Amino acid sequence: MAAIHKIGRRKCAVARVYVSEGTGVITVNKKAFATYFPTATLQYKVLQPMSMTENVTNYDVKVNVYGGGSTGQAEAVRMALARVMCEVGEGNRAILKPEGLLTRDPRMVERKKFGQKKARKRFQFSKR
């Protein structure tokens, strides 16, 4: 099997994932998976598509991810891995689709407006 390449996005983060048959080694930006995503929550998010389709130890994953913060990057990797799992197995799409792992989350940061402190917050109003 040749390496499968997919892209996932979330907020400003973009993840490029290369998956090939192997023993379950995951590297993110040339670092170990547990080093790059130290918290259990982020690790769970990244591994979710592979664990749901029971493919954690069947494939080696190489990830290039940039932009955004740690949560956005983890969810971008999750999106890309879910797309790869759909291509690898026929029945995987039926498993991942109801969980919402194949749907791009459209929520982005709302821009700051002039005449206001932040996107929604106004400057203090003085009646007199």
UniProtKB/Swiss-Prot annotation:
Keywords: Ribonucleoprotein, Ribosomal protein. GO terms for molecular function: RNA binding; structural constituent of ribosome. InterPro entries: Ribosomal_Su5_D2-typ_SF (IPR020568), Ribosomal_uS9 (IPR000754), Ribosomal_uS9_bac/plastid (IPR023035), Ribsml_uS5_D2-typ_fold_subgr (IPR014721). GO terms for biological process: translation. The keyword Ribonucleoprotein applies. Pfam families: Ribosomal_S9 (PF00380). It comes from the Bacteria. One of its GO terms (cellular component) is cytosolic small ribosomal subunit. The keyword Phosphoprotein does not apply. Belongs to the universal ribosomal protein uS9 family. HAMAP family: Ribosomal_uS9_B. PANTHER family: RIBOSOMAL PROTEIN S9 (PTHR21569), SMALL RIBOSOMAL SUBUNIT PROTEIN US9M (PTHR21569:SF1). This is Small ribosomal subunit protein uS9. The gene is rpsI.
